[in-house]
Amino acid sequence: MVFFVSDEVKPKKGGPRMIVTGYSSGMVECRWHDGYSIKREAFREDELQPGDGQHQRDRA
């Protein structure tokens, strides 16, 4: 699945809802707030699924 910058995603194995902030070296860069600070991590696309609040776009 292709994600766009500002899409909401979450890890398939469970975890926080995150926002896609970009792509680097074939990885999806994400950020989220854990209640104390902003966290960031890069994931493979196949590790992510759409979040509950994912933006609806015309992906044609």
Per-range role (PLM):
Residues 5-47, 59:
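Basic/aromatic-rich interaction segments and small domains that mediate binding to polyanionic partners
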Residues 53-60:
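Long, low-complexity intrinsically disordered regions
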